[in-house]
A protein has these predicted regions:
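Flexible, low-complexity segments enriched for small/polar residues
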Residues: 1-11, 17-205
Length: 205
């Protein structure tokens, strides 16, 4: 704290220089700083859009207003009424975001988001072509590619094995060889994304 205070005082109380010092410091990039806070609902929603390169179909009306409204609505359902904080300090929940109703809404959002397959329906969607960019001929490499795209997330070998097993299991519960096709991308890869977005590790920044 002291070294940042010195920058602030020494640079004529410049917020710009203070921010520069913080964002370029070793502490900012340390392992302790990564995945130390729970994503706020806005971070969860907007981050999910950006990390997978989602597109947006506004339906009827102004594109920007409809997109923003969807973000606000989803965030509010998760417990964060954007631009209407509980007090002047804003939200200081962190682990408080992890509650029964909030987590259920996160799971519901991730399912609805990744299930929206095309521009035919209003809302954010990820096309099969976009998902194909992260899909690999080997199931384990596919899992790791999506863990990287959605984070990068560090998960246990057991979690990787479980996600890999999901890709190699058909709807009847039988073990099958992993192949890359329009069908597997549309079904299994979308399911994989939903499972990753439901992981405890994905809830953290």
């Amino acid at each position: 704290i002291e070294k940042f205070a010195e920058v602030y005082l020494g640079k004529d109380h410049s917020i710009r220089e203070l921010a520069r010092a913080v964002f370029t410091s070793d502490e900012f990039f340390s392992q302790r700083a990564r995945f130390a806070l729970v994503k706020t609902p806005v971070e969860y929603v907007v981050g999910s859009y950006r990390m997978l390169g989602a597109q947006y179909n506004p339906g009827e009306g102004d594109r920007r207003n409809r997109r923003d409204q969807q973000t606000y609505t989803r965030s509010r359902l998760m417990g964060m009424d954007v631009f209407n904080p509980p007090d002047v300090n804003g939200w200081d929940l962190n682990i408080g975001w992890v509650n029964t109703s909030g987590m259920l809404e996160r799971f519901n959002f991730s399912n609805a988001y990744i299930s929206n397959r095309s521009a035919d329906a209003p809302g954010a969607f990820v096309s099969n072509d976009q998902l194909r960019k992260y899909t690999r001929p080997a199931s384990k490499k596919t899992v790791k590619k999506f863990l990287s795209a959605l984070g990068p997330l560090k998960v246990s070998s057991a979690t990787i094995k479980q996600l890999k097993g999901y890709l190699e299991t058909d709807d009847q519960g039988r073990t099958v060889a992993w192949t890359v096709s329009d069908q597997t991308i549309d079904q299994k890869v979308r399911g994989l994304v939903h499972q990753i977005m439901s992981l405890p590790e994905y809830q953290l920044n």
